[in-house]
Amino acid sequence: LAYATATKLYETGEEFKEKLFGIRITGIFSEIRSLVEVKHKNNKDEKAIGRREIRNIKSDIETKLKEFQERYQGLKASRIHIRLLKAFPGMKVMKRQDAFNDLKEKLTKKGTLVFGMDLKENVTGRIQNYLSGIIRAIVTGLLVLLQFAMVIALSVFLKGYTIYIYTFIQILSIIIIIGLVNDHRNSSYKISWICIIAALPITGHIMFLLWGNRRGRKIEQSLLAKLKHGTGFYDYDPEIQRQFTEKYPMKSRLSRYLEANSFPLYKNNQVTYYPMGEDTFEAIFAEIEKASRFILINFYIVGEGVLWDRMHALLLKKIKEGVRVLFLYDDFGAVLRTPKNFKRSLESEGFEVRVFNPILKYTDKLYMNYRSHQKIIVVDGNAGFTGGMNLADEYVNLVTRFGVWKDNAVRVEGDAVWGLTVTFLQMWEASADSAPLDYNPFRPTKDFPANDVYCQVISDGPANNPRNPVENSYKQMINSAKKILYITTPYLIIEDDMRDALTTAAISGIDVRIITPKIPDKRAVKLLTNYNYGRLLESGVRIFEYVPGFIHAKTIISEDCAIVGTINMDFRSFHLHYECGVWVCDEGTVDVIKKDLLETMEQCREVTYEEWKRRPFYIKAFQMVLNLFAPLM
């Protein structure tokens, strides 16, 4: 048993020969194998290994592991569960199985086996929920439910005064509806509230006064002021815009629109596309290894696990080398999967940490909806990453939640990295009440080779409503496409104007294709996504469902430009969350992305209009009801 175990470990280490923080560790597997080979060089029959012999071998292995720990004292071990069971698929004898389980448990508890792992490897990750986070989430939920209960109680109480209340409600309804009709917010959002008010005469009115009006506008204005402070550090070069217009005359309208919304156009960039989360994080780790000045990290979800262990250890190493690490995460995205003292623990280790929008701060405004969904990593101001990935094991397929998890990202090296840096620092400022930040120390330190790869970093959020640069960028991408339009999105909950743009493109002869997940992470959202297929399919849009699992990638490409980032095609991304992405105009980059999307479509099942029409009646009815509240979900 021990011989087979050591052999399995040795082969894993030998095959991939990875390094962890510069220390090659595959030798430990060789040492264990040599140890066991000596003990059993004359015994090839695994069944002959008795329980006493197993205990002796286990003791020797533990001794070697202890020696290895002492040799590399201070090296944080990745908490990787070793899947020894795969080495012994035919084991059926209970006594031997007990011995095997005992050995596996002992090794796992020790936490001493450190892998310089390739994230594509067969390593088991974990999803760990913390009691403190669960309690915070429950408290938040109870506060919201309490508000609902108070609304209902007040409604019941007021119904006792029917004669007086009726006239008041009628007048109030007229006032609210007139206000909504003349509001600059999205029409679908307004229609949803009108339906609620009409369906729930008293309760709906109170709900709107609590959560539907713009009483929180002062908070948004304060946040917007902090975001605008960052735009003052942007540099605009009219010559770049002129050169771009000469090369891409049909795209200059979008570029000028983005510049008018404080997103400069940059050239001299090198863009690398990563089709999976595993590829992305290996590149991120390699970039962090080279950091000498600072590392900026912003994620929506942070979950402790194998991926976090490796990131944490690497960042600790860089902090000890004198590198400044600014770590920003969204409170809602991390509440369940990080311990209560997570922020304080990181700060005690030398991290600079800020938490965006604590979930208990604005429960009266349902402010848990207004999240930072951005994902940004910047190293020394010279290279940056953004995409759909989060800092949790499922994003690199170390755990299986919804089949194969497909994500994507881009690495940008060049002048456009400053756009990612400013976007990060804007959210950093917005996450604390502090003096205005000087962005200049975070500028790049090197000049980049001249080329014609054009990029604009875009970002958006509810503070910008009703101006939505991200949504309008998508619409302009759709309207300016000449040959192809390929989109990947985990959620497809779109408004009439976006749907009209897609159907018009398809009817005009553009090859419009959309990839969505076959396996959903949210069933209600999947039903709404499926509901939105109808008019698109009828107009000639081709829709593909990713059969292996869940596609979390957020991408839109035409024949010569692309947007890769954090933006889902739904109301939440376009209106309720803070998002970011990179608009790239470069045929070479677009060809790489297109190749990946075409290969992904080969793993998909295409949905037909005839199939969509054959949905069961009860599904159709439920989808129609859900669609009324789509902007509020």
Regions from the PLM with identified roles:
Residues 81, 296, 324-328, 486, ...:
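A structural signal for isolated positions on well-ordered beta-strands in alpha/beta enzyme cores
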Residues 6-10, 14-17, 29, 33, ...:
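Residue-level detector of alpha-helical secondary structure
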Residues 491-510:
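Helical hairpin unit composed of two closely spaced alpha helices linked by a short loop
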Residues 1, 34-36:
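Conserved catalytic cores of phosphodiester-cleaving nucleases, focusing on short active-site segments
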Residues 42-48, 73:
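Charged, low-complexity interaction regions
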Residues 80-90, 96, 110-115:
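Short, mixed-charge low-complexity intrinsically disordered segments
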Residues 13, 105, 109, 114-472, ...:
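N-terminal localization/anchoring segments of enzymes in phospholipid and broader phosphate metabolism
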Residues 497-500, 514-517, 521-538:
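Extended hydrophobic/aromatic segments used for targeting, binding, or gating
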